[in-house]
């Protein structure tokens, strides 16, 4: 099974494809790289980003996709720009693959190192150790993408891939009404 891990960014997008064999619990790095996005107008940048993702998807058959979720940032403009890239990425993945999973940086760090507050060097060390890689992986966007793919493989192993742990219903879905007079939406 090929898992594509993506660390989206508005300047650099890290990606990694790992082969996961669940029956023998084996992980192997197939390909990893960076999609560099040049400083241009936003529409051109988004097109370059999507074209880069398209090349990755069309080059190797992908079974599962895992994307790092948007996290808190101090600059609202950066978050808005990243959200636009994420929207384009989400649409492309849905069109080509059919679905994807998302993981927060905290979830990835905890899955890879056991510590949700681990720094990037600790994550990089564990990624290399898990995959048995020698040498340094640069830039860290690639390491993050590999870590995201590994995190997804762990969720597959525990059959927890498509769960929604944050979803809590106060009442059964069938009892919700579209009638505003009843106070439900």
Swiss-Prot record:
Localization, UniProt: Cytoplasm
Example GO BP: DNA recombination
Chain ranges passing through the membrane: none
Domain of life: Bacteria
Cofactor binding comment, as recorded: Binds 2 Mg(2+) ion per subunit.
Binding site for Mg(2+) 1: 7, 141
Keywords on record: Cytoplasm, DNA damage, DNA recombination, DNA repair, DNA-binding, Endonuclease, Hydrolase, Magnesium, Metal-binding, Nuclease
CDD domains for the chain: RuvC (cd16962)
Gene3D superfamilies from the UniProt entry: Ribonuclease H-like superfamily/Ribonuclease H
Complex formation: Homodimer which binds Holliday junction (HJ) DNA. The HJ becomes 2-fold symmetrical on binding to RuvC with unstacked arms; it has a different conformation from HJ DNA in complex with RuvA. In the full resolvosome a probable DNA-RuvA(4)-RuvB(12)-RuvC(2) complex forms which resolves the HJ.
Family: Belongs to the RuvC family.
Function: The RuvA-RuvB-RuvC complex processes Holliday junction (HJ) DNA during genetic recombination and DNA repair. Endonuclease that resolves HJ intermediates. Cleaves cruciform DNA by making single-stranded nicks across the HJ at symmetrical positions within the homologous arms, yielding a 5'-phosphate and a 3'-hydroxyl group; requires a central core of homology in the junction. The consensus cleavage sequence is 5'-(A/T)TT(C/G)-3'. Cleavage occurs on the 3'-side of the TT dinucleotide at the point of strand exchange.
Protein name per its UniProtKB record: Crossover junction endodeoxyribonuclease RuvC
Chain's gene name: ruvC
């Amino acid at each position: 099974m090929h898992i594509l891990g993506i660390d989206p960014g508005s300047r650099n997008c890290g990606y990694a494809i790992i082969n996961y064999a669940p029956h023998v619990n084996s992980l192997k790095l197939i390909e990893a790289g960076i999609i560099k996005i040049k400083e241009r107008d936003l529409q051109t940048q988004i097109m370059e980003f999507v074209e880069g993702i398209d090349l990755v998807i069309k080059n190797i058959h992908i079974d599962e996709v895992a994307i790092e979720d948007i996290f808190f940032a101090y600059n609202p403009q950066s978050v808005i720009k990243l959200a636009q890239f994420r929207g384009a990425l989400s649409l492309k993945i849905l069109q080509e693959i059919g679905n994807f999973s998302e993981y927060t940086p905290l979830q990835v760090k905890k899955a890879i190192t056991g510590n949700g507050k681990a720094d990037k060097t600790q994550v990089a060390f564990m990624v290399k150790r898990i995959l048995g890689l020698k040498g340094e992986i640069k830039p860290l966007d690639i390491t993050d993408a590999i870590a995201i793919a590994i995190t997804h493989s762990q969720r597959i192993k525990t059959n927890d891939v498509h769960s929604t742990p944050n979803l809590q219903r106060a009442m059964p879905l069938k009892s919700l009404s579209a009638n505003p007079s009843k106070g439900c939406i």
